[in-house]
């Protein structure tokens, strides 16, 4: 999957999970500061990403995923 395709899929998931317009979801968007996610939203978002991309995101890694770009990079790295 290309980075653009990954970004679009992440953008769609984030938009749905956080009830924000997909246009607001940019690479630099911080889940909590920019998109209004709380800690429960973040956990649910990680679970949705794991399911959508068929990957496992350990808690330690999830703590380092603060932005949409972080999520895309992590997924790209996992899918090699």
Curated annotation (Swiss-Prot):
It is found in: Cytoplasm. GO terms for molecular function: acyl binding; acyl carrier activity. 4'-phosphopantetheine is transferred from CoA to a specific serine of apo-ACP by AcpS. This modification is essential for activity because fatty acids are bound in thioester linkage to the sulfhydryl of the prosthetic group. GO terms for biological process: lipid A biosynthetic process. GO terms for cellular component: cytosol; membrane. Residues 4-79 form the Carrier domain. The modification O-(pantetheine 4'-phosphoryl)serine is found at residue 39. Pfam families: PP-binding. SUPFAM superfamilies: ACP-like (SSF47336). Belongs to the acyl carrier protein (ACP) family. This is Acyl carrier protein.
